[in-house]
């Protein structure tokens, strides 16, 4: 796999080890030399848009925001932005020269900006307010996972956010969970949350066998986000096959989804989960009668 594609799958940035789980050393070296991947610090790599955001913000006299700010803070995102996002003060006009950036307008307090980037809490709430639910949830999960923001802080900030976008911010804040391992799992959970009758919990322990990426304990449904990242070795593949078999022996129905389908065909994933909930509910009702 190409190194830039690997970073896209990882959420826009990753450690050297994470990248090399998906590609080769030669491919990573070549991508860095070509400028398609940048090295942020020792052992950490990102897509070039991460640095481009600061350059664009300085050129526009604005502030790095939304997904660009999330990447700046080291959080993984569902899908890295094609162009950096910059927020300008409401009175500020765009310069006549063309700048490669998505521009939005908002008045930011001094405390909400750190070194030209929206502060961590403002970044999470902005993403929750303005981005689609899966994208906002992935950022919030990542922020919680990193320890940079707490659940209580996020809920308080969402509750006190401006009326426009507040319902979306509250939805993300209430659903956010730092146990979600990566943006792939966050995006899958965002879809599952919208399925009637399905109530999932991330990284749910099943007996002594292991953890399911997502699980509905009441219905006995285990949902797995399948990625080459975690099947890079034969032993990892064997482990997961045995784990799924053990789940089934404990009366769990295992449903597995590919990254491509979760990211690009969410309506299909939603339809499958809806069918699985219906089938499992019917089966449980028959068995109980």
Model-derived regions: residue spans:
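Surface segments flanking catalytic/ligand-binding clefts of nucleic-acid enzymes
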Residues: 23, 144-289
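Short gly/ser-rich loop at a beta-strand->alpha-helix junction or flexible surface loop bordering the NTP-binding
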Residues: 1-165, 277-289
């Amino acid at each position: 796999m190409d190194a830039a594609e690997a970073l896209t799958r990882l959420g826009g940035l990753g450690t050297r080890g994470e990248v090399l789980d998906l590609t080769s050393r030669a491919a990573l070296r070549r991508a860095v030399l070509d400028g398609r991947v940048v090295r942020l610090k020792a052992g950490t790599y990102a897509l070039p848009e991460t640095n481009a955001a600061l350059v664009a913000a300085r050129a526009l006299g604005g502030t790095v925001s939304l997904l660009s700010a999330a990447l700046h803070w080291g959080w993984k995102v569902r899908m890295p932005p094609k162009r950096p996002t910059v927020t300008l003060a409401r009175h500020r006009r765009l310069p006549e020269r063309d700048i490669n950036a998505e521009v939005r307008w908002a008045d930011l307090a001094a405390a909400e900006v750190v070194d030209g980037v929206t502060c961590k809490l403002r970044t999470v709430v902005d993403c929750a307010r303005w981005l689609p639910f899966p994208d906002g949830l992935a950022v919030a999960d990542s922020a919680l996972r990193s320890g940079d923001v707490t659940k209580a802080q996020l809920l308080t900030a969402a509750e006190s956010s401006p009326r426009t976008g507040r319902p979306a911010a509250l939805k993300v804040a209430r659903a956010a969970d730092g146990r979600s391992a990566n943006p792939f799992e966050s995006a899958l959970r965002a879809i599952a949350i919208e399925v009637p009758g399905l109530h999932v919990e991330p990284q749910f322990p099943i007996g002594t066998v292991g953890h399911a990426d997502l699980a509905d304990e009441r219905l006995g449904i285990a949902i797995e986000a399948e990625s080459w990242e975690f099947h890079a070795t034969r032993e990892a593949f064997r482990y997961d096959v045995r784990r799924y078999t053990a789940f089934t022996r404990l009366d769990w129905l295992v449903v597995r989804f590919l990254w491509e389908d979760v990211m690009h065909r969410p309506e299909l994933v939603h339809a499958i989960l809806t069918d699985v909930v219906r089938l499992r509910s019917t089966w449980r009702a028959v068995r109980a009668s």
